[in-house]
Structure formats: C-alpha cells, structure tokens
Amino acid sequence: MTPEHLPTEQYEAQLAEKVSRLQSMMAPFSDLVPEVFRSPVSHYRMRAEFRLWHDGDDLYHIMFDQQTKSRIRVDTFPAASQLINTLMKAMIAGVRDNHALRHKLFQIDYLTTLSNQAVVSLLYHKKLDEEWREAATALRDALRAQGLNVHLIGRATKTKIELDQDYIDERLPVAGKEMIYRQVENSFTQPNAAMNIQMLEWALEVTKDSKGDLLELYCGNGNFSLALARNFNRVLATEIAKPSVAAAQYNIAANHIDNVQIIRMAAEEFTQAMNGVREFNRLQGIDLKRYQCETIFVDPPRSGLDSETEKMVQAYPRILYISCNPETLCKNLETLSQTHTVSRLALFDQFPYTHHMECGVLLTAR
C-alpha cells in the first residue's frame, strides 16, 4: 500500500487474516467466532495530517514511509474522505503563490464529517500576524465560494487563530435515530465514521434490555455515552480532556438527552472516588451511591486498563470493552476472565490495509 494507492482487491483477504488472528488471540478466553464489521474500501478516513514540502516554486503534501523514513509526495489520498481530497487540491492552489500563507508553513491537518463540514488547520514555524489573518480570511471565502463548508485555523508556538470556530458538527444515523456530535479540532474523534456507526449500533444491540444505569470511563465527546443513553435509566461518564468535556456537554443538549452526567476526571481518580479512597470537589452535588450501575463501558487508550481499574470493573455484572489494541485487551482478560466470561465478540475494521484491529467484547459475570 502507498498513500496514493489502496490495494482494494486485497481487502477480503486482509480482513479474513484479521478475523483469524483475533480468534487465535481470544482462544484462551472464548471460542466465539467474531462478529465482523467491514469498512468501506476507500474514502473511510474523516481526518488526516500531512507535512508540507517546499520544492522551489512547488508545494505539496508529503508523508513518510514508516520503514525507510523516505519522503512520499501525496497529491491524492484515497483512504481519506472525498472532501479531504477536494480540500487538498484547493489548499495547495490557494497557498502555493501566497507568501503570507506559504512562508514557514510545515503541516496541514484536515478534519471532516459525513455531513460535509471541514476544519483545516495550518501549522507554522513563525508568528502569525494581521497579514496572515487577512490572507487566510480571503482563502476561506474563496473556498466557500466553491461550495466548501470549511473553517480555517492557524497554529504556531503558543498561538491559535480561529477565523470562525474550531469545531464541526457530525450527524450520524444510529439505529434509526440521528445523533449530533460536535468534533473539536485537535481533539480525539473516531477516524472512520462508517465504522463508528457500526460500533455504536453493535453496542446498542448488545446492551438492549439492560437494567439499571451505565458507567463509562474515557467518554471523549460522549460518542458512546449519548448513543447508549436510550438503553439505560441513567449514564454517568468520565473524561479528563477539557475540550472533549465541553463538546460532550454540547452534544447532550443538541441531542435533547436528559439522563447523562459527565464528570471531568481521570479514570484512575474516579476509581479512587468510587472506592472511597479520596474525595473530589468535582463530585460535589453528585451522589455516586444513587447510581445503580449494572454495566460499565470502557474504551481505553492503547495501553489498556491499569490494574486498579481492572479491579474496579470486575465489580460490575456486565463489562462492555471496546479495544483499539487486542494485545492489551487480552492482557486485561487474564484478570477479567477470573470473574467474567466473554458473551459477545466483534471485530471492527477501523483501519483497513493495516495490521491494526479494533474489537469489542461483552463480558458477563460468572
């Protein structure tokens, strides 16, 4: 695979290899055959980052080969959304001959939605002044005149200039209901929107007929919390990143959801609070004992759950675990399988044509 060519003819074989690999990894814990959720074979990535290469008068996007570290020119990127591909051409055309926009520009980041909105961030090794703002405003207006719903941001050391806003609003059809998700520039969002829809619908399906409340750790912008709210009496969710918490609060209001409470704290801190080890001012007014959480949802970073959180989640009758790294999932399962069994297993092909796998397991208490 190269940035400008996807081996779409190999998609089925690559997916089959992942299914086999996941099944082998999970064999010590389950004999379930994974439920498999396929990605679109192209234009599946909703965000992308590129370095910029200045070559005389020419200017173009580049990526680096992971093995050789050699530079690869990228004029089209079929893994990314159609909108990103359109913007790549438009941004180069708009920046190449404009000194204020081109000088010391070293990277462009693209964030798009299925609803055809975009935030484009230009990163510089220089101070951004009024001349830059005027040139960027003219470029934004020219892009919008082409029918592109785009917002531009300039970034430099200790500087961030938003011409309008630093977010876009995604609209996803999830099990018969449209969900609105505010996505903030430079914050985590699910990269493969089509796969995100399938993950949300799978999580809804495996938690239907749930009793009690849901606790979620690492909730981000509320991606799973808000979709799952319809299956539970109440949802209590934690997140540490301020922009993600703000986006989650917006998303709660935008989706007219009244049974989700977001707390800004790390999963490790919340574990201490739940165990009565420490008290936190951020929890004033929230009576944790009122929540009857029968299910806990975790979508941890690649490192998986730490040992204290492992112990905490074992106290819940059901654990829904979305993993971006099956190796650390299996490490966690060495502990979790002492008290729980794997009742559902899914493979989500979030990153086609790579060795990366995303998977989901539902664990039920023995």
UniProtKB/Swiss-Prot annotation:
Gene Ontology annotations for the cellular component aspect, listed alphabetically: cytosol
Pfam families according to UniProt: tRNA_U5-meth_tr
GO molecular function: rRNA binding; tRNA (uracil(54)-C5)-methyltransferase activity, S-adenosyl methionine-dependent; tRNA binding
SUPFAM superfamilies referenced in this protein's UniProt entry, alphabetically: S-adenosyl-L-methionine-dependent methyltransferases
Catalytic activity field: uridine(54) in tRNA + S-adenosyl-L-methionine = 5-methyluridine(54) in tRNA + S-adenosyl-L-homocysteine + H(+); uridine(341) in tmRNA + S-adenosyl-L-methionine = 5-methyluridine(341) in tmRNA + S-adenosyl-L-homocysteine + H(+)
Active site, UniProt feature: C324, E358
Gene Ontology process terms (BP): tRNA methylation
Superkingdom of the organism of origin: Bacteria
Binding site for S-adenosyl-L-methionine: Q190, Y218, N223, E239, D299
EC number: 2.1.1.-, 2.1.1.35
Keywords assigned: Methyltransferase, S-adenosyl-L-methionine, Transferase, tRNA processing
Entry function: Dual-specificity methyltransferase that catalyzes the formation of 5-methyluridine at position 54 (m5U54) in all tRNAs, and that of position 341 (m5U341) in tmRNA (transfer-mRNA).
Family: Belongs to the class I-like SAM-binding methyltransferase superfamily. RNA M5U methyltransferase family. TrmA subfamily.
NCBIfam families per the UniProt record, alphabetical: trmA_only (TIGR02143)
Protein name: tRNA/tmRNA (uracil-C(5))-methyltransferase
Organism: Salmonella paratyphi B (strain ATCC BAA-1250 / SPB7)
